[in-house]
Amino acid sequence: MPCYCLPGGLQNRAYCIVTSNKQHMVISDSRFVPPQQEGGKADIVETITAANTLQAKRLFVTARNRLFDIARWGNISEGISASFQLADKNGHIKNGLPQVGDHIRINVPGPGSSAGAGYDWVRIEIVQEANEPDKEFAVIKVRPSAAPEKQKGTAHFFDSAATSSFIVNREGRHISAEIHGRNEKPNMETEKVTDQIRNFVVGAAATEGFAKIQWQKLAKGILKVQTTRS
């Protein structure tokens, strides 16, 4: 069995960790993951199991910090093709923790959305954390939105009924990174025909599995630990 070293200066100690991509939803609260009603959906779940609770808590903190460091999602996700930037309600790039009302600016390969000045945009609707002795979680829920400077329309290849929920969860020794997409349909309610064509092509590719591949890379990156052999 492979052994992994905890990041953050603990490379002198090896801990055995079991990895898995068992597809079950750990978080089922409809506030965080809305009901599926129409269009496509995605459920990505990656899990690791720590040797003990102390190690699990440390791994959770690392994963939680990666979840909230949105600008580095592309850096921690091997092979992901999109890039992400956290922006405030006015569209200005910002550092620090995400807040409700902030936006995420997404740069998808290929032609960009003219409605979003070349980018796709989502607005953060929920940022929530909970910490209990044997259970912890952190959640970011987003929805396609207008570009901040326009405040109308939807500058995204999915329409505004879609949501994406990004979750890090710990129960005992088990830590999961989850990404749940709901009600994903191409955004055809745009002013320009070129945007409609682009959104149909990109949105269809996303619902057919391309987005799932990208999100799985992000989930793996959030949970990634450095490996050594004992």
Sequence positions of predicted segments:
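Mixed-charge, low-complexity intrinsically disordered regions
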Residues: 3-5, 15-103, 109-116, 153-230
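Short, solvent-exposed secondary-structure boundary/capping segments
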Residues: 128-145
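Residue-identity detector for glycine
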Residues: 8-9
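Short beta-strand-centered aromatic/proline hotspots
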Residues: 117-129
